[in-house]
Amino acid sequence: DAKELADPAFNAQKQALKWGLAGFSSTTVWLVFGAFIFALGYEVSGLGRRIALFLVKFMGKRTLTLGYAIVIIDILLAPFTPSNTARTGGTVFPVIKNLPPLFKSFPNDPSARRIGGYLMWMMVISTSLSSSMFVTGAAPNVLGLEFVSKIAGIQISWLQWFLCFLPVGVILLIIAPWLSYVLYKPEITHSEEVATWAGDELKTMGALTRREWTLIGLVLLSLGLWVFGSEVINATAVGLLAVSLMLALHVVPWKDITRYNSAWNTLVNLATLVVMANGLTRSGFIDWFAGTMSTHLEGFSPNATVIVLVLVFYFAHYLFASLSAH
């Protein structure tokens, strides 16, 4: 800012480099990275697929309960998978996509109405709900908290976020699958094929492996520390501790982590965006923008102001292909 530039001892080149790399020291960025490695653990160990198949087996005899199963699967994986692409697209979808062909239901075809259309719609609903319910359910959530902390100085914990969203989340969990079933009712409402197929797949996978049991233990440990240990240990330290234990206990090989492009791309992108947010604050742009917007919205009722801001946010998304960038 102006005061720094006026200081004779100010070294522009040194401070520019320090500022440019500051994002990589953000605890939020490393929390997201750690959660991505958790997601990799679900994939490598096969635990994510096993959870999905288990719920499909016991809830798949009715199409409606199968819809609930899809949402529950996503919610169970969401606390440790901050990428809805990796979670819904990489873990849940490969299981669910095998179900419509069992009933000769195919995309871009009238047969999609049999069951495929409903299941795919539930995939969209499940990823939207699970991404919102947990801070670590989607990278933009964590990035947004970082911005709130940098700009407004407000700290929101993992547990606070979850408890605030929980009432709405429970209502959506109960209503969304049923309402979708009513508005877009599939032609096939009962079947034994889905549960039978999932049971056969589980038999093929065999019993829980050592890596799966280890990952379950690490998941429970991390969740417990995030919820109850926030006063003792930082959330990021919990995530990095879990990653270290996953490596030490051979749940995820180091070579798989180095090849996990999504995690490294997110690390670099989020760190860069954190730096940009900090720069906008220090340069005074945030104060200027807030003042300008408040001038234009002066005289509006609180409800009208919220509507305008939501519309601006909504239509601005057309300019971005990434939620994190948006």
Task: Identify the role of each PLM range.
Residues 84-88, 103-206, 214:
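Juxtamembrane and boundary regions of transmembrane helices in multi-pass small-molecule transporters
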Residues 74-78, 130, 168-176, 180, ...:
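Alpha-helical transmembrane segments of multipass membrane proteins
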Residues 66-70, 120-123, 168, 211-222, ...:
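Hydrophobic alpha-helical transmembrane segments of polytopic
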Residues 2-108, 260, 264-266, 270-326:
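Membrane-embedded alpha-helical segments and adjacent helix-loop junctions characteristic
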Residues 116-122, 215-216, 258-268:
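Alpha-helical transmembrane segments and their helix-start/interface "positive-inside/aromatic belt" motifs
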Residues 14-27, 154-167, 207-210, 227-238, ...:
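Interfacial loop-to-helix junctions that mark the boundaries of transmembrane helices
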Residues 1, 20, 178-185, 208-213, ...:
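Flexible hinge motifs at transmembrane-helix junctions and intramembrane kinks/re-entrant loops
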